[in-house]
């Protein structure tokens, strides 16, 4: 669910910026190397290559199922990405040295842990996994060298959203940075990108995976000019889960500094989604499959549920019961019912479609909320307009007036149709298919098919 949440959040922002006339490059993808992938493939009785092909195909399905407007899907097993990761290594070579190392490795996080990061000897994010004590010769990135430069980067408000994640990152850096391992011995882990010039080592998965942010743009060759346009000259936003602050805001930024590449402008972190107050787990039987939700409720309903009823930045709890209640109350009885009522009255009583207004009432408020990554607040503004339109119908009773005073009644219906049109346009980045259906209904002066059937 976390991946689906960030895909949809990023899609809303991409659609908003495109609508404003800004060029956008929106990329998603899959990290396909590392011990976790290798062990999962073994468990499935497959070779890593076959396993990741299936894994990537499942993620690629999400583009259609969630109606994502993404421009690229980057696989870290692709030849272009492998070449980019190796070039990143070469450009960081002045900050890389080989050392012998012993440490505790969490396969779930794909990272080494210090004793102070563990709770009762286990990773707090993966308590079912016992960290593996690893002793081997690895290449290390001189992370400690970048302490002051990272603090300077983090001092800029807006470098990390929300603000308390920025404070968390600053505190981590001020606590002192330790150089970190960026390779594994090939004899222990063969599934990885080869280290340039050393056949005995493969890259640590995070060094490889983080490079996807620029490999997807065609770096280092940049034959299409996308890297220059969107990274060097554009404004770069990364969307990630709260457990990635150390990797995205510190490790990756230090790598970029070392390679003399511009740093990310903003990184937005979302919270976790729990179910019934607990982390989703097959053993607990509380896993919510987003694909099942799309099949039952439809794409736009799932987008709505994630954007309005999940906090953009804090942990949120979702249950199947709550999802059904939100769907019924806000989509079936709310938005869907309003559009059906108004357009049925218009179809029966107006001689022609209304002349739709050019502007959008409330657009500036929506943009302001989205600029602050407040997806839920933006939707609350739109749904308050839906509630207000419902109240207007109840109070003014246009269905009666149109019979007793046709001229006044038709004016009332035209005004309601204009508001339905306005609501439809405001919904465009959040619920694009629903937005299109609403606008089509107003332009044709017809009641649409049931937008959100009662389930």
Give the predicted meaning of each segment.
Residues 1-28, 80-87, 122-348, 354, ...:
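Structured secondary-structure scaffolds
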Residues 93-102, 111-118, 134:
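Short, flexible, mixed-charge glycine/proline-rich loop motifs
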Residues 25, 29, 46, 101-104, ...:
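Basic, alpha-helical terminal appendages of large translation-related enzymes
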Residues 94, 108-111, 125-129:
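Short Cys/His-rich local motifs and their 1-3 flanking residues in nucleic-acid-associated proteins
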Residues 1-95:
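N-terminal Rossmann-like or analogous alpha/beta NTP/dinucleotide-binding catalytic cores
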Residues 91, 105, 112, 122, ...:
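The −1 position to Zn-ligating cysteines in a subset of zinc-ribbon hairpins
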Residues 344-359, 377-381, 393-403:
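Short acidic alpha-helical/loop segments enriched in Asp/Glu that coordinate divalent cations
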Residues 72-83, 98-111, 269:
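Short, glycine/charge-rich beta-strand/loop segments that flank catalytic centers
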